[in-house]
Regions:
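Intrinsically disordered, low-complexity terminal regions
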Residues: 1-283
Length: 283
């Protein structure tokens, strides 16, 4: 009987710990403010906003973006005692999504659903996530940025020039990209995966311990790693490639016509293809 009671207690503790681990906490401004714990009564609220071309998420909200014609829309689904603590507004052509100042909250679910005809900028500062539900097509340049531990995911991007960056421990995972010039940068311990890319020119840099993986095709590519990070582009076919490593990081690339390599430190550059080489041997 005692063993059974102990087993039941253990199971209850496991479920309790799991439930707690699913909660998110956010505090802005005064940490001494009383924490608002989300209720179990969930509501949906439509928020009227002006036109915007950029989305900026601060803090921990999760955002789903859908590209569609018509007026822009914002719909929030969360607990009834949390919803009025959000600060959602359009300023300088940017939709800002976050919490009001001096807020201390604990919640389990906060979904923000956003729709607009066009975007040219997407950014996350904090631990929030953005999901591009049906991709994004624009004739403009497009900037995608994560600063912090948040994530941006999606598939089906078509734009002019594209700039994608991670600063911190966040992740960006986007598939099926068509653009003119692609610029990729990872600073910190974050990771980036871009699959099935079609680009004219590509520039990719890693600073720190993060990594980036790119697949697809490009005409020219310039790669650099400073630190212990890794750049995996052996599945990204390029005609002409320049690759440099400073530190202990690594680059794996794919060049068909020409490859220039420079290394400083213990880092390495590996390649596939049969290009003309400018690859001085270390003395």
């Amino acid at each position: 009987m005692r063993k059974l009671a102990s087993l039941i207690t253990c199971i209850c503790l496991i479920f309790s710990t799991t439930a707690c681990s699913q909660s998110k906490n956010y505090s802005s401004g005064n940490w001494s403010n009383k924490k608002v714990v989300a209720s179990n009564n969930y509501v949906t609220k439509d928020i009227k906003v002006d036109n915007f071309m950029k989305i900026s998420v601060a803090g921990s909200p999760d955002v789903t973006f859908t590209q569609k014609s018509g007026r822009p829309g914002v719909e929030v689904y969360t607990s009834d005692n949390i919803i009025d603590l959000l600060d959602i507004k359009v300023k300088d052509n940017t939709l800002y999504i976050g919490f009001k100042k001096n807020v201390n909250v604990s919640y389990k679910k906060l979904d923000v659903r956003v729709s607009a005809e066009m975007l040219n900028g997407i950014s996350v500062a904090g631990s929030g996530d953005i999901f591009l539900k049906n991709g994004l097509q624009t004739d403009d340049n497009l900037t995608i940025n994560v600063a912090g531990s948040g994530d941006i995911k999606g598939s089906g991007i078509k734009c002019n020039d594209m700039k994608v960056s991670v600063a911190g421990s966040g992740d960006i995972n986007v598939n099926n990209i068509t653009c003119n010039n692609l610029k990729v940068s990872v600073a910190g311990s974050g990771d980036m995966v871009l699959k099935n890319v079609t680009a004219t020119g590509t520039e990719a840099s890693i600073a720190g311990s993060g990594s980036a993986t790119i697949t697809g095709t490009t005409q020219t590519a310039s790669y650099s790693v400073a630190g212990s990070g890794d750049l995996f582009t052996e599945g990204y076919e390029a005609q002409r490639v320049s690759a440099s490593v400073s530190g202990s990081g690594n680059i794996k690339c794919f060049a068909t016509e020409f490859l220039k390599v420079r290394t400083s430190g213990s880092g390495k550059v590996g390649y596939k293809g049969n290009p003309e080489l400018d690859y001085p041997k270390k003395s």
